[in-house]
């Protein structure tokens, strides 16, 4: 038991500090912006300090455990803890949120509320990744939806209310299944509700009941990940949201679904997972092909990037379904890798829109000469998205491939077939990615417009882009840093789960 509440401070600090925004003096938006960025940077540094000095990477058990009785009547505890599975997403959350608040610098309308919602979202996401109690997990899952809905409905495009309503209907519908699963596991087999992750992991269920629990949790996480056919909220949401909100959606929100699949479906419901894992491979493979093909037909720039995100999530599903150390490590690496690449692409799409006020690719063209810095950065991240060797996406997708090939669970012919179809998906990725760059940056549509109408990337945008690019390059060159966090925990999940 940890005696100093590091994790509680890390979870509560952003929303508590965010609530103080409303009491700041009325001296313009600059004070609010700097205050929010200071809180994000301080939170990120505090998180990094805590993990550096109080977390042992070679220990697969839960560390920094905190357990406080919260509601006596339900035996509900404020129970936090981290392990190799959660430390990566928590650091990713801090990094992307800090950059998203910097990206939101131009937002001036209701900036107090906007920045408070960003910080409230920060708290909910870190709370979800560090929770060790099923009901606390559900509360953080729900708490995170409210800021996203408000950010969508108040700071978005012309169809923002439609996309916000669609988002909340999909995610709230999925949350019903999550709540049913949480209550089912909590109330099963004892007079006292047992919501502790450790107790639930050691609990055995009748197979039909475990399958029902698995399907309930799977639907909830499939909406958030998203998994086809529950993905249609994502392109509409990304198409209308402000690009700083898109950075949080692509960088962190989608990863919550993947984290839930590993943390609950794989760790707590291992027998059902071994039954459904072949179906995960099939769904993941179809998703890679379908989303890549659909992305190619999108006229809207942000919707094309959104479908590319759906395609890349297919690799995470396949890695989770492979039931191998290699495949699961590859899926966790893809979670981190796509967090940076997806956030960067949406940021660049948003800054481009700020300049040319166009969202349809067939109306663009010839921007490369007018904005060479944005062209260079966008092209670089497009290469990272299509898994260029030396970038993080290449390592993640390659390791997922190896995970499928080395899996002992599947016969040779299905493995060859799935690998072949995945390879087709990887061929489609450069087609839609390079086509997007060609339509935006080449051609003559903007060639004859005087340069005074446009300005290239400024210092703030360059700093943001470089900050997102360095981790992509660093992970691509040295992925062992990420693996060192998760490899022991992955071994424990697979050995405990599938030897029961």
Swiss-Prot record:
One of its GO terms (biological process) is ATP synthesis coupled electron transport. It comes from Coffea arabica. GO terms for molecular function: NADH dehydrogenase (ubiquinone) activity; ubiquinone binding. It is found in: Plastid, Chloroplast thylakoid membrane. One of its GO terms (cellular component) is chloroplast thylakoid membrane. It catalyses: a plastoquinone + NADH + (n+1) H(+)(in) = a plastoquinol + NAD(+) + n H(+)(out); a plastoquinone + NADPH + (n+1) H(+)(in) = a plastoquinol + NADP(+) + n H(+)(out). Its EC number is 7.1.1.-. Pfam families: Proton_antipo_M. This is NAD(P)H-quinone oxidoreductase chain 4, chloroplastic. Belongs to the complex I subunit 4 family. Keywords: Chloroplast, Membrane, NAD, NADP, Plastid, Plastoquinone, Quinone, Thylakoid, Translocase, Transmembrane, Transmembrane helix. The keyword Signal does not apply. It is a multi-pass membrane protein.
